Amino acid sequence: MHIRSLELRDYRSWPELKVDLEPGITVFIGRNGFGKTNIVEAIGYLAHLSSHRVSSDAPLVRAHAENARVSAVAVNQGRELAAHLLIKPHAANQASLNRTKVRTPRELLGVVKTVLFAPEDLALVKGEPAERRRYLDDIIATRQPRMAGVKADYDKVLKQRNALLKTATIALRRGYGTEEGAAALSTLDTWDGQLARLGAEVMAARFALLNELGPKIYEAYTTIAPESRPAAVNYKTTIDQGLSQFSEFDAGIIEATLLTELAAKRQREIERGSSLVGPHRDDVDLMLGDQPAKGFASHGETWSFALSLRIAEFNLLKSDDTDPILILDDVFSELDAGRRQKLVGIAQEVEQVLITAAVHDDLPENLKKVLTAQHTVTVQDTDTGRISLLDVQP
């Protein structure tokens, strides 16, 4: 897979960008803050409908603009698809595929497949559980676009359930002894059923994914850091004890176990006013030997583990018969010589690689020799603020 052309309008610092891309390795050179990362972020947003840098859409729209647009023509095994996404900071985003408007932007999932490695990926190892959950959910949505809808529905149910637990605390505590309490508990029962059903689908998909990813993560880490301890990953849930007797996890078993755990923790949830059970509280344990990587890994081991997660993701998507686009965002300056060479070796075997770097000297020498194209990103101050420009001679 590769992107043949990319167009941006009012996306962050880019009032307008039109660039033709080719298979091979393309690099965007520009000083920090000039807007080079915005280019690859836009491609990643088109692939995942989310940014690796921010959690909301508002920062993606250029100051004083009403919306932003990202358009790309993707080529996959000779077939071209044109994807267009309109990003609205205060309304629902809109999308079209081959100039035909689609019902929801989620229908674009899978049109562009990317794997992005960036300095922010250290948070996969050192950060909060939400980072690791998102890592899994993004891969699942890329491979099974329907699951993005399931996860969105789960999030809506969770929000409604939490709202009930917070606003109807007194009624819920009174229980079935009052009409108001009985009504609140009946509503909570309804949310419990939906939370368990949707949550079971999310968890089953995560379990299945980790079963595939685990060996690939181990292999990638062993290749990158052969002198280090072996890497392993384990899914950690709020219902671990209830599932421990099963060797395989299916949605039906998980749903029943979730319902049991929700019933057991109901009083605590009412007291705390929040949902204590479900995939929104799960985590992935990243292990080096018998120790968790978080808190025990060295800086080099942390980089190696983060890179291994992305390499495993890439290899998994590639095994689905599609070479995803590999994006390397300002990472070569952060890696030691050994890890740089490992990454160059991978990049040379990928159909399309997009790289950002602050200066040309950040690139390994053997990578410079195989570049397909190089673009320079600069900036210009205007009446409406600083804007980014591509390949403009001073």
UniProtKB/Swiss-Prot annotation:
It holds the Pfam family SMC_N. One of its GO terms (molecular function) is single-stranded DNA binding. CDD domains: ABC_RecF (cd03242). One of its GO terms (cellular component) is cytoplasm. Signal peptide: none annotated. It is found in: Cytoplasm. Transmembrane segments: none annotated. Its main location: cytoplasm. Keywords: ATP-binding, Cytoplasm, DNA damage, DNA repair, DNA replication, DNA-binding, Nucleotide-binding, SOS response. It comes from the Bacteria. One of its GO terms (biological process) is SOS response. ATP binds at residues 30-37. NCBIfam families: recf. The RecF protein is involved in DNA metabolism; it is required for DNA replication and normal SOS inducibility. RecF binds preferentially to single-stranded, linear DNA. It also seems to bind ATP. Belongs to the RecF family. This is DNA replication and repair protein RecF. It comes from Corynebacterium glutamicum (strain R). The lineage of its organism: Bacteria, Bacillati, Actinomycetota, Actinomycetes, Mycobacteriales.
